[in-house]
Structures are given as structure tokens and as C-alpha cells.
Amino acid sequence: MKLFNIKHRSDEVSFRQAVLQGLGRDQGLYFPHRFEALEDVKDLLQESFVPRSVAILRHLLGDEVEQSTLREMVFSAFDFPVETPEITPGVRALELFHGPSLAFKDFGARFMARCLGEFHDGGPMTILTATSGDTG
């Protein structure tokens, strides 16, 4: 997956580089060049959250992360009950308060932590985090 710096479109990086670097030049965010359409969406909808997440990430990242490694990263990031109650027929909502911290960050931050753990070279790394205000 190639991503570009939204402030400098010619700056391209891989997913791995974007995770490790965080921000691009001039504090630009990284964004994918394009999203390829998912095939077999109906089949994906039959899967539970974690296997579905693995399939979607595999589609987005291609071979940038080995499939067994990606599967392990996703399964370890979401090792808690993921609830998606039906709101109306055919419409579900992802409840973001079932993780270890009982906050939405369990979905984004835990996977990001797995990515950082997998991608870094073992040298020193500083990770700065903050609360959103409602949990800290």
C-alpha cells in the first residue's frame, strides 16, 4: 500500500514507513493513493469482526505484512469481545466500549501498538500518547 503526504503529494511511503514515521514533512498526514474495491463483500459480512478485519487489512496492505503475522497482530489487538448489535434490520453498530480500557481507543490504539511492535527495528522508540479527555 502506497500512501502520500497530503501536504506534499510527491512524498510517498509504504504503510510500514507511515506507521514508523507518524507524520510526513510539514506535519502532513499520510493517505492512501487509492482504495481498491473489495470483492465478495457479502462473504465478508458473514465473518465475525476479527476475521473480517484480517481480510480487509490483507486486501489493503497486500503482501506488505505476511498473512500469518497480520492475523496474529489483529487477533492479539482485539482479544476482547467485539459487540455489533443490530440497530435495525441489516444495520449494525460497533460498540467501542467493550475493550480493556472501555474506550474507543482500544480499537485504533491497540492495532497501532501491534504495528509499531512488529515494524520497529529493536532500537529506541518514543511513543507519545494522550487521552481524549473523557478517559484520562
Task: Write out the residue ranges for each language-model feature.
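PLP-dependent amino-acid enzyme catalytic core
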Residues: 1-136
